[in-house]
From Swiss-Prot:
It comes from Pisum sativum. This is Malate dehydrogenase [NADP], chloroplastic. NAD(+) binds at residue 206. Disulfide bonds join 76-81, 417-429. Belongs to the LDH/MDH superfamily. MDH type 2 family.
Length: 441
C-alpha cells in the first residue's frame, strides 16, 4: 500500500543528534561491534525512534514516532526506521503478513543480485511485504552498510525492514526463510578435507543459531559450498527445525542441464522438463537424461546420440562452472542468484502437473535406495506450501545406477569427514578423490 495521504495529527520523531549518519553497536562478549544500526532522516537523525500509527482499512496516515527504549534491540536500518507500522495493515487485504528473510554472506556478489530480486517482489509476489535480515562478518560490515544504503535508495515499497549484523542469533531471529550463502572459498593449497572442516564450523554455528531463534518451520537453503554436506551439518545442529526443511542448492546445475539439452535439440529451454540432478554438488553430480523430457518426449527419442548424452552432455554440466570462470574471471553470481529464486519459487508455487524440480534434501525415507542420513539431490514436487514430496515415477538403468553409486559414496565419505560437527564422533577423512567444483577452488 502506497503512502497516499498525510495527517498532521501524527507526532514528529524525537531528535537526539544532528548527524546525518550514526551507528549503534552492541556487544556480547567481544570488543568489536557485533550489530550496527544507522538511521537516516531528511534533516536530522532519529536515534531511538520506532514509528507506528493506527491504520484503518482503506486509510493511510503518516506515522507517529514513539521513543524506543535505548536498551531494546535495534531492529531497523536507515529509512526503514521511518516506515509505518504494518500490524494494522496486515488485517486488511492489501498486504499479506510480513515475512522475515535471513541472508548470510549478504555483502557478496551472489547476494548483491539476490537481495534486489527479493525486495522487488519478484520472488514472493507483489503483495508480500518482507524484512531482510543480513548477516556479514567483521571484515565485510562496511560493505554490508553499502548494500543497505542501496536498498534504501531503491525505494522498494515491499521492503519494510532491513537489519545488518555479524551475529547469527540476531539475524536469524524469527526467520521464516534462511538463505545461507556465506562460506569460505577454497584458496591455493587448501585441501578439500580442510575446507569441509572450515566451512563446516560456520554451518554448525549457524545451525545452532537457527535452532535457538528461527521460526520452528523455517525453510533453509544452503548455497555455500560444499553445500550438500554443509546442509547436513546445519540440520544436525538444528533439531528443533524439521530436517525436511533443509535444502542444498542444485538448481543451477538443473538449469545448466536444461540449457545444454535445449541447445542440442534446437529448441527453447522451456521445452525441457523433468530434469533431475542427482547427488552431490560436485563433478560427481548426475544430470539425468533418462527421465528428462523435451517437448513432452523422452530425451532419448529426441536426441538419438547416446554417446553425446553419456559423455559430452554430462561433462558439460559438471564442468560448466569452471568454463565460466575461465571466460569471466570469476565464479557464477548472477545465474546463482537466479537459481536461488527458482528454488524458492518451486517451493511456494505448485509444481506443474507431471513435472518436477531438483533439490538437495535429506535422504531418510527416500524411495530410491539411496543411503539414509545424507543430503542428496533428488526430484521433488511441491503443492506450493513450502513443503515438497519426492517423485516416485522415475526409472533407472544400469548407467544411472552406476553414476548414483559414485556420488553417493562421495557424500558418505564427506559425512565421515565432518562427524565431529554432526555429533557422530571422531572425524575420519578418506575422500575418494578431489571432485570439488572449480568454482570452489
Amino acid at each position: 500500500m502506497a503512502l497516499t495521504q498525510l495527517n498532521s495529527t501524527c507526532s514528529k520523531p524525537q531528535l537526539h543528534s544532528s548527524s546525518q549518519l550514526s551507528f549503534l553497536s552492541r556487544t556480547r562478549t567481544r570488543t568489536l561491534p557485533r550489530h550496527y544500526h544507522s538511521t537516516f532522516a531528511p534533516l536530522h537523525r532519529t536515534q531511538h525512534a520506532r514509528i507506528s500509527c493506527s491504520v484503518a482499512p482503506n486509510q493511510v496516515q503518516v506515522p507517529a514516532a514513539q521513543t524506543q527504549d535505548p536498551k531494546g534491540k535495534p531492529d531497523c536500518y536507515g529509512v526503514f526506521c521511518l516506515t509505518y507500522d504494518l500490524k494494522a495493515e496486515e488485517e486488511t487485504k492489501s498486504w499479506k503478513k510480513l515475512i522475515n528473510i535471513a541472508v548470510s554472506g549478504a555483502a557478496g556478489m551472489i547476494s548483491n543480485h539476490l537481495l534486489f530480486k527479493l525486495a522487488s517482489g519478484e520472488v514472493f509476489g507483489p503483495d508480500q511485504p518482507i524484512a531482510l535480515k543480513l548477516l556479514g562478518s567483521e571484515r565485510s560490515i562496511q560493505a554490508l552498510e553499502g548494500v543497505a544504503m542501496e536498498l534504501e535508495d531503491s525505494l522498494f515499497p515491499l521492503l519494510r525492514e532491513v537489519v545488518i549484523s555479524i551475529d547469527p542469533y540476531e539475524v536469524f531471529q524469527d526467520a521464516e526463510w534462511a538463505l545461507l550463502i556465506g562460506a569460505k572459498p577454497r584458496g591455493p593449497g587448501v585441501e578439500r578435507a580442510a575446507l569441509l572442516d572450515i566451512n563446516g564450523q560456520i554451518f554448525a554455528e549457524q545451525g545452532k543459531a537457527l535452532n535457538a531463534v528461527a521460526s520452528r518451520n523455517a525453510k533453509v537453503i544452503v548455497v555455500g559450498n560444499p553445500c550438500n554436506t554443509n546442509a547436513l551439518i546445519c540440520l544436525k545442529n538444528a533439531p528443533n527445525i524439521p530436517a525436511k526443511n533443509f535444502h542444498a542448492l542444485t538448481r543451477l546445475d538443473e538449469n545448466r542441464a536444461k540449457c545444454q539439452l535445449a541447445l542440442k535439440a534446437g529448441v527453447f529451454y522451456d521445452k525441457v522438463s523433468n530434469m533431475t540432478i542427482w547427488g552431490n554438488h560436485s563433478t560427481t553430480q548426475v544430470p539425468d537424461f533418462l527421465n528428462a523430457r523435451i517437448d513432452g518426449l523422452p530425451v532419448k527419442e529426441v536426441i538419438k546420440d547416446n554417446k553425446w548424452l553419456e559423455e559430452e552432455f554430462t561433462e558439460k554440466v559438471q564442468k560448466r562452472g569452471g568454463v565460466l570462470i575461465q571466460k569471466w574471471g570469476r565464479s557464477s553470481a548472477a545465474s546463482t542468484s537466479v537459481s536461488i529464486v527458482d528454488a524458492i519459487r518451486s517451493l511456494i508455487t505448485p509444481t506443474p502437473e507431471g513435472d518436477w524440480f531438483s533439490s538437495g534434501v535429506y535422504t531418510n525415507g527416500n524411495p530410491y535406495g539411496i543411503a539414509e542420513d545424507i543430503v542428496f539431490s533428488m526430484p521433488c514436487r511441491s503443492k506450493g506450501d513450502g513443503d515438497y514430496e519426492l517423485v516416485n515415477d522415475v526409472i533407472f538403468d544400469d548407467y544411472l545406477r552406476q553414476k548414483l553409486a559414485k556420488t553417493e559414496a562421495e557424500l558418505l565419505a564427506e559425512k565421515k569427514c565432518v562427524a565431529h560437527l554432526t555429533g557422530e564422533g571422531i572425524a575420519v577423512c578418506d575422500l575418494p578423490g578431489d571432485t570439488m567444483l572449480p568454482g570452489e577452488m
